[in-house]
Amino acid sequence: KILFPITTIIIMEAFINKMRKLKGIRKLILIEEAWKAIASANMADYIKYLYKTVRKYFGEAIVVTQEVEDIISSPIVKESIINNSDCKILLDQRKYLNKFDSIQNLLGLTDKERSQILSINMANHPGRKYKEVFFSLGGTQSAVYATEVSLEEYYTFTTEESEKMELFALADKLGGNLELA
């Protein structure tokens, strides 16, 4: 609890120093599980500063979170992230169907983009295993794409605990060989 904000600030400060020194080189910082950082007012202020500054130095900031609510519920970062994000990537948002009007307004989505987002994974081909994802580029282009991964890629990135346990049990039976499992 104490080390998380300290470690995060050290990493982000190192990025900001590099960002300022490396001229003409594209820089990127990706903040995974951003909800943890956004939950802290000090960290949220830091992310706001980062978003307002990074583009001036040929850089990009990306926040990844499972809930749109994490971003829109933070008054500190909400406007800076949304106003400085030319690219929006959204997965299935059906669980927000009842409050999608406010999400649409906040993200500045057109009715076409709203329809695209709410169509995600609604009519997937039954014979194929894929998930759909929405991309919007600067509000001028948007589309829904299918992403299909190999079984190996799926098991590498799945967060389903039961699937991971099954995979590790099979690997144990095969002498610890995850590739064979």
Label for each model-derived stretch:
Residues 1-21, 120-181:
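Conserved P-loop NTPase motor module
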Residues 1-115, 151:
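Conserved P-loop NTPase motor cores
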